UniProtKB/Swiss-Prot annotation:
NCBIfam families on file: alaS
Biological source species: Trichormus variabilis (strain ATCC 29413 / PCC 7937) (Anabaena variabilis)
A GO MF label: alanine-tRNA ligase activity
Keywords associated with the record: Aminoacyl-tRNA synthetase, ATP-binding, Cytoplasm, Ligase, Metal-binding, Nucleotide-binding, Protein biosynthesis, RNA-binding, tRNA-binding, Zinc
Protein's name according to its UniProt entry: Alanine--tRNA ligase
Length: 880
């Protein structure tokens, strides 16, 4: 057998894998959508995910054997994309599955056969791993397959024991690795060495069930779940350095490189990373849109928007300034359409979505650049040299402005960015996002899944009752089932029935108390997991036990505020559709006790007049006292009546309809007032953009409006006292002060410019003549960067054909440099941006810009004379 595997295309590999298992009784199934049926998962992240209900015993399989090529997306380590050999957001997982049919022996035999005979991998290049306690698999590999003991590695549970959660189906797994360097021998094989080994096939043997105590018992029906990464096996068979250089991705990279006017193989590592990011992310966004995901600021729509923006940002980093994403998307579609015809069928939708998002984000980037200019001017005005991490993070988070670009522009202006502070802000955002998107604890979920067959679904009676006598069905502490818990313990409680509303549809869960004989539990939150309402709280007094009869009572005042705010969101959507645009649709919401938040899709913000009209319309509806009509209807009938549904939301066959006749009708499971008059009053407190194409309104209702107005009154009074004017005179006074400040700033800038010009005009006498060119290289004392640039432009205009290089030390340890070249100098091969960037390095800095005009900065003022001497020498050499 040859020492290297046979070369196959990615499409050939996919086909051969599926055909191999089809010939062995497996049903070939099409890839499931990237939008999973499992509500606990945002995107399809694994080949086995569509079969999870079967593995958990929740669904009877139609086939005993199946094989798929499943498209998957993972973004948990998105910053590693392009930086490692094999990390991607989009990947295909080839898999073969057995549902209570064949098991370990057959799975291993076929895994070896397809690897060595179908794909032609040399046996001497393969190493296998097994779970350290799985002697059965070890013996099969050694005695039946013939792998030498030196090439069978026993691994711990972290690497080779698969679990679906803290409880439930689980089992050992065995992995097949390819060895890129078998010449290093079999001694001291380290499978963690990714320069030598790559794991490409994982065989999971689901043979146990783990209970809450960690005990393992054999499953009656054992299952097989395998996964072979298509990109990984393609890298091996095509013998390329990484997944990105396979024929699955590299044509996309080449397209991006061509647009940028660069060559991938001769590019530096930073440029290669950007090209890889583009190649990977474009595959992701094409398939996401094909699976009917739309860019938004929530959920999977946010993931899509983030990926698109990263493509645009990395395009900028490699020199692409305009729109380009659809050119690379077309290449991705062409590569995928044979396996996934839906990408070509939905080509128009895909390209329209990408074009819209790219255009909007380019505008956002432009706004970010302008904001950065303002930040730079402010920092300089304050005599500082560092842009705060908070400012850089605002640019990154709000405008999608990459830190690298902020740093580059800052350096051109003799500034630095506080990267440590930026990382602190980034971590805060991660923690905020984690808290904002936190769902029920997976440990709780696993425990409830295990108990589901023994207890009934929670009966929710909260639409009509605020109190209920109930029985404690399940008691959990840290997600582990317990029989009892004492005072001071944080618990999760499932009752047989409850008046507590569980967080859903944007409305937060109720608060309140669960009490009994000597027992008081303060309930802080309620979440729904499957058919169970989980009450999160703390035992304030007594000992709570499973089976206890208790009284569950919600905080009535909090509920009233929440339901008033929820109805107000319905009225808000109706008013927006009526007054602003009938095509407006909800993109998200938050209904809490003290305020409401409503996100909606709109290409523009609301005018002040529109906000006032919306507010007035809602308050009119409140004053008109419209009564609610609540019905449960078949979904088709509800839609036929005109009920508004949330785009992308999944509904059952029957839906709850909240109807305020003549005003609003929506599908909704939340709690609402029985009459709009109960809301009292409504006030919009803010309207702003939260993402491209998504606006957010925050508002308050009822007594919260009075609280809001009291705070506003206090602010107005404080300002009136400070400026010594009446409240109604404040706008005029502030406008006057702003005008005075602008006038003063303009006068200051004018004086600086006049000073620089006065200093620079004297330099005309010192110009050197080199043939048809004149050059001026000089240092001006104490001139700021902007004035230095103006001086250079003026001097170049005076001398005509030539080059001007000026330097200055506007403040201690700060160097400012500028180069201005005429077109004739450019024709000699000199580019101002590259030239001044190289000169600035002498001063410990850098910079760049256009071929005819560029600025740079440095940190070592003592080296400025040397830098200018070098500039003069290079200009004379090039132009003399």
């Amino acid at each position: 057998m040859s020492s290297n595997p046979q070369h196959l295309s990615g499409n050939e590999i996919r086909t051969r894998f599926l055909d191999f298992y089809a010939q062995r009784g497996h049903q070939i199934l099409a890839s499931a959508s990237l939008v999973p049926e499992d509500p606990t998962v945002l995107l399809t992240i694994a080949g086995m995910l569509p079969f999870k209900p079967i593995f958990l015993g929740q669904r009877t399989p139609e086939f005993k054997r199946a094989t798929t090529s499943q498209k998957c997306i993972r973004t948990n380590d998105i910053e590693n994309v392009g930086r490692t050999k094999r990390h991607q957001t989009f990947f295909e997982m080839l898999g073969n599955f057995s549902f209570g049919d064949y098991f370990k022996e057959q799975a291993i035999a076929w895994g070896w056969e397809i690897s060595t005979e179908v794909f032609g991998l040399p046996k001497e290049r393969l190493v296998v791993s097994v779970f350290e306690e799985d002697d059965e698999a070890y013996v099969i590999w050694r005695d039946q397959i013939g792998v030498t003991e030196a090439r069978i590695k026993r691994m711990g549970a972290d690497d080779n024991f698969w679990v679906s959660g803290p409880t439930g189906p689980c089992g050992p797994c065995s992995e097949i690795y390819y060895d890129f360097h078998p010449e290093r021998g079999d001694e001291n094989i380290d499978l963690e060495d990714d320069t030598r080994f790559i794991e490409f096939y994982n065989l999971v043997f689901m043979q146990y069930n783990r209970d809450a105590s960690g005990n393992l018992t054999p499953l009656q029906n054992k299952n097989i779940d395998t996964g072979m990464g298509l990109e990984r096996i393609t890298q091996i068979l095509q013998q390329v350095p990484n997944n990105y250089e396979t024929d699955l991705i590299f044509p996309i990279i080449e397209t991006a490189a061509k647009i940028a006017g660069i060559d991938y193989h001769s590019s530096d590592e930073t440029t290669k990373v950007s090209l890889k990011v583009i190649g990977d992310h474009v595959r992701s966004v094409v398939h996401m849109i094909a699976d009917e995901i739309r860019a938004s600021n929530v959920g999977r729509g946010y993931v899509l928007r983030r990926l698109i923006r990263r493509v645009v940002r990395h395009g900028r980093l490699i020199g692409i300034s305009g729109e380009f994403i659809n050119q690379v998307a077309e290449r991705a579609i062409a590569l995928s359409e044979s396996a996934y015809p839906n990408v070509r069928k939905r080509e128009t939708v895909i390209k329209a979505e990408l074009e819209r998002e790219e255009a909007n984000f380019l505008k956002t980037l432009d706004r970010g650049e302008k904001l950065l200019e303002e930040i730079i001017q402010q920092v300089k005005k304050q005599g500082q040299t560092i842009i705060s991490g908070e400012s850089a993070f605002t640019l990154y988070d709000t405008y999608g402005f990459p830190l690298e670009l902020t740093q580059e522009i800052a350096e051109e202006n003799n500034l630095t960015v506080d990267e440590d502070d930026f990382n602190v802000e980034m971590q805060k955002q991660v923690e905020r996002a984690k808290a904002a998107h936190e769902t029920i604890d997976l440990t709780v979920q696993g425990s409830l899944d295990k108990l589901a067959e023994h207890i009934h679904a929670t009966e929710f009676i909260g639409y009509s009752q605020a109190t209920a006598t109930a029985k404690v069905e399940v008691l959990l502490v840290d997600g582990v089932v317990q029989e009892e818990a004492e005072a001071g313990t944080e618990v999760q409680i499932v009752l047989d029935k409850t008046p507590f509303y569980a967080e859903s549809g944007g409305q937060i869960g109720d608060r309140g108390y669960i009490s009994g004989d000597g027992i008081v539990v303060q309930v802080e939150d309620v979440k729904k997991e499957s058919d169970f309402f989980v009450h999160f709280g703390r035992i304030e007094r007594g000992t709570l036990r499973v089976g206890d009869s208790v009284t569950a009572q919600i905080d009535r005042a909090g509920r009233r505020r929440a339901q008033a705010n929820h109805t107000a969101t319905h009225l808000l959507q109706a008013a927006l559709k009526t007054i602003v645009d009938g095509g407006i649709s909800q993109a998200g919401s938050l209904v809490s006790f003290d305020r409401l938040r409503f996100d909606f899709n709109s290409p523009r913000g609301l005018t002040a007049e529109e906000i006032q009209q919306v507010e007035e319309q809602i308050n009119t509806w409140i004053a008109e006292a419209h009564s609610a009509k609540i019905e449960v209807l078949p979904l088709a009938e509800a839609k036929a009546r005109g009920a508004v549904a949330m785009f992308g939301e999944k509904y059952g066959d029957e839906v709850r309809v909240i109807d305020f006749p003549g005003v609003s009708m929506e599908l909704c499971g939340g709690t609402h007032v029985s009459n709009t008059a109960e809301i009292g009053v409504f006030k919009i407190i803010s309207e702003a953009g939260v993402a491209s194409g998504v606006r957010r309104i925050e508002a308050v209702s009822g007594l919260a409006v009075l609280d809001y107005l009291n705070v506003r009154d206090k602010v107005v009074k404080d300002l009136s006292d400070r400026f010594k004017v009446k409240p109604e005179e404040l706008p005029e006074r502030i406008t006057t002060l702003q005008n005075e400040l602008r006038t003063t700033e303009k006068q200051l800038e004018t004086l600086k410019g006049q000073l620089a010009i006065a200093k620079s005009d004297s330099l005309l006498q010192t110009a050197d003549t080199l043939g048809d060119h004149k050059i001026i290289v000089a240092q001006l004392e104490g001139v700021d960067p902007e004035s230095l640039k103006s001086a250079a432009e003026r001097l170049l205009q005076k001398i005509g054909n030539g080059a001007v290089v000026l330097g200055s030390v506007p403040e201690a340890d700060k160097v400012s440099l500028v180069a201005a070249f005429s077109p004739e100098v450019n024709k000699k091969g000199l580019q101002a941006g590259k030239f001044i960037g190289a000169i600035a390095k002498i001063c410990g800095g850098g910079g760049g810009g256009r071929p005819n005009l560029a600025q740079a900065g440095g940190r070592d003022a003592s080296k400025l004379p040397t830098a200018l001497e070098q500039a003069q020498s290079e200009l004379k050499s090039a132009l003399g």
